[in-house]
A protein has these predicted regions:
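Active-site anion-handling motifs in enzyme catalytic cores
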Residues: 1-300
Length: 300
């Protein structure tokens, strides 16, 4: 029997209400985290003898001593975790473990064309984390070449310390991936996504494109969007966002959606003709559902 302890907000077998998600933040602020987490777990759960347990984004959910005695490994799926506010407590937890630790799909949060010639605020924290993990495993999996280049500036080597593996969400369907080829017209069902990290022109462009398709939907992914949809609260952010209030037309027309689990999300996208926007996992979800997607890139 394989007993896997992993970093994540929920398991693929759990479903939480919108209210619970808002109060406990099991999505880690972004429901896109479900996607790569499900991809990792689907790859690991190869038989009925595999037991999985989430830490619900709480480093102290189980004490290190308990984890050492009751689990075979600690799996750490990550997104763009190498950033300025990188969490040091995860490093401390890993150092206390005696079981193997596996980092899968970690990425660097940076500008579109990052400058690696200058030190970054998170350098020391990232170096300590990667070193701690490598003491418990042979290698870590990173999302792309830019993350690899960043780790090289910290003294780590590709092939020895890390390997570029892409985003784990793309593993979810294995080789059985079929993308439909719809004929698009003004009546097509098109799903849009966007975020505040995208530039103002990008957000305006996405909003403009929505007007070209009457049967459009905007798919939210972050906690503030869920709070607006579920509670009617204004979207709280320091800069102007596309749909901040329930008085906006998209709310009034019932064209805004937020999905609290991956199956329902992909079911809705499978019934769509195209997904378009600046959210990586919002578009990957569409591809996994068999729907073509167009990603507007905003960073590395």
């Amino acid at each position: 029997m394989s007993r896997i302890y992993y970093r994540g907000g929920m398991s693929p077998f759990e479903t939480f209400s919108p209210g619970y998600i808002l109060t406990h933040n099991v999505i880690g602020t972004n429901v896109g985290n479900f996607l790569y987490l499900n991809g990792v777990l689907r790859s690991l759960m190869i038989d009925d003898n595999t037991v999985i347990q989430a830490n619900y984004y709480n480093t102290n959910y189980y004490k290190p001593e308990y984890v050492n005695e009751n689990f075979d490994c600690f799996v750490i799926p990550l997104a763009d975790a190498f950033r300025e506010n990188f969490v040091n407590e995860l490093t401390s937890f890993v150092k206390k473990l005696k079981i193997p630790c596996y980092v899968i799909g970690v990425g660097l949060k940076e500008s579109y064309e990052p400058d690696f010639s200058q030190p970054k605020p998170q350098d020391e924290a990232v170096k300590k984390f990667v070193t701690a993990v490598l003491e418990k495993s042979n290698c870590i999996g990173v999302r792309g070449e830019l993350t690899g280049k960043y780790l090289e500036t910290l003294g780590f080597a590709e092939g020895r310390d890390f390997m570029v593996i892409g985003c784990p969400s793309m593993y979810m369907k294995g080789k059985r991936l079929h993308i439909q080829n719809p004929k698009l017209d003004v009546n097509s069902k098109v799903c849009f996504n966007s975020n505040v990290a995208a530039s103002v022109p990008t957000r305006k462009f996405i909003k403009l494109k929505m007007k070209e398709f009457e049967n459009h939907y905007f798919i939210g992914q972050v906690v503030n969007e869920l709070r607006s949809i579920y509670l009617g609260a204004p979207y709280e952010y320091k800069i102007e966002y596309n749909f901040r209030n329930v008085t906006d037309k998209i709310y009034q027309d019932g064209r805004l959606r937020f999905f609290c689990n991956v199956p329902k999300w992909m079911e809705f996208l499978n019934d769509s003709d195209l997904t378009f926007g600046s959210r990586l996992h919002g578009n990957i979800a569409a591809v996994l559902a068999g729907t073509p997607a167009l990603l507007v890139t905003k960073d590395s």
